[in-house]
Amino acid sequence: MTTSGLPSPTAGVLERARSDPAYGAFVLLRVGFTALPILMGLDKFFNLLTTSPANWEGYLAKWIADLSPLSPVHTMMVVGVIEIVAGIAVAIKPRYAAYIVAAWLAGIIVNLLTFSGFYDIALRDFGLLLAALTLARLASLYDPAWGRHAATTANPVVR
């Protein structure tokens, strides 16, 4: 309860997450794929999370840098904007945005595999790609399609 005597808007989400493990997984993945891309995107501008190699542009494959009309630093800033938008999109509509994040992660994996030294990060990002696809599948149950109403039951029928 809030101080106004009304139930907290998050109380229902937390109770449902405790009683329905799949819904709990959906909520955790949604929060993670909202916050983490936004934080990583912001870091493309502030470089607080990485200082080597040469900040974020050190993770950009040369062939991709050569394709970009921008400098590697500015290319990574564009990447940062895309990551921020992806995180916001997951917050708004994970049913669709999770597939966009998965495709984005696939692109990052291709980038990392095309030059040596970052295979461990590519493997980690593959795990994130699988988690994004899992979020998309869970969102098909818990996030209504555009123009449709949410399921009225706490545990929708899985087909």
Regions found by a protein language model. Name each.
Residues T50-L60:
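Short Gly/aromatic-enriched secondary-structure transition segments
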